[in-house]
């Protein structure tokens, strides 16, 4: 993605998050991005598909960045802790990004895929290695509960009810306890130092 496309995607994400709508017009996008209308036409395939492009790029980007940030961490519980807390911290650092995720995570297929990447793989690995104790038939429900916990933590941060550290650690602790870890171990893993989100 070139610089102009990145700028347009960023502006579109802000507009979508603020309005809650999945459509926008070229003029408002150009104004929000601080570019000419011609720049929009020259850098986007089809403005009417911009929402889907932004959502898909966002999901792919977070998968890549979280995977890089948790490289070298073998324990599935520690990887889950890092991944969930990175989502919550990023919502604090980039509120428009967080609002976009919270607003559209359940209604957009590309964003639903956020939970199908590293979080799902870490859950499967945890089951396969005996780290987690839950029935395999409940995998999809468990993934939904963990995703919902993450979104709720992001919401608490965006609304100013909790700090990102508190909300992220609480969500991880509850998720790990639900996966069968002891309260003490879940709390310890949920409060480990968080690595930076890779670029």
Question: Predicted regions span which residues?
Answer:
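Hydrophobic/aromatic residues within well-ordered alpha-helical segments
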Residues: 4, 47, 54, 58, ...
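Amphipathic alpha-helical packing segments from all-alpha helical-bundle domains
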Residues: 63, 82, 105-151, 155
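Basic, helix-initiating cap at the start of DNA-binding domains
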Residues: 1-35, 49-52, 60
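Amphipathic alpha-helical segments used for helix-helix packing
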Residues: 86-110, 116, 120-127, 187-194
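Hydrophobic alpha-helical connector segments
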Residues: 53, 64-97, 107, 168
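Short hydrophobic/aromatic patch on the recognition helix
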Residues: 33-44
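Conserved hydrophobic residue
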Residues: 21-22, 45, 132-133, 162
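C-terminal peripheral helix-coil segments that are non-catalytic and often amphipathic
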Residues: 121-129, 159-199
């Amino acid at each position: 993605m070139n610089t102009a496309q990145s700028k347009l995607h960023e502006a579109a994400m802000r507009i979508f998050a603020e309005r809650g709508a999945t459509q926008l017009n070229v003029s408002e996008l150009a104004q929000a991005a601080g570019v000419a209308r011609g720049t929009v036409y020259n850098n986007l395939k089809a403005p009417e598909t911009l929402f889907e492009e932004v959502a898909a790029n966002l999901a792919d980007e977070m998968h890549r960045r979280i995977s890089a940030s948790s490289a070298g961490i073998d324990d599935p519980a520690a990887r889950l802790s890092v991944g969930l807390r990175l989502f919550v911290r990023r919502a604090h650092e980039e509120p428009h990004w967080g609002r976009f995720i919270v607003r559209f995570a359940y209604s957009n297929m590309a964003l639903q895929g956020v939970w199908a990447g590293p979080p799902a793989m870490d859950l499967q690995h945890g089951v396969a290695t005996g780290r987690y104790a839950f029935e395999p038939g409940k995998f999809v429900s468990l993934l939904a509960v963990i995703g919902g916990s993450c979104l709720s933590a992001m919401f608490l941060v965006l609304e100013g009810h909790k700090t990102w550290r508190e909300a992220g650690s609480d969500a991880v602790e509850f998720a790990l306890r639900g996966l069968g870890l002891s309260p003490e171990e879940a709390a310890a893993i949920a409060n480990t130092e968080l690595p930076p989100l890779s670029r």
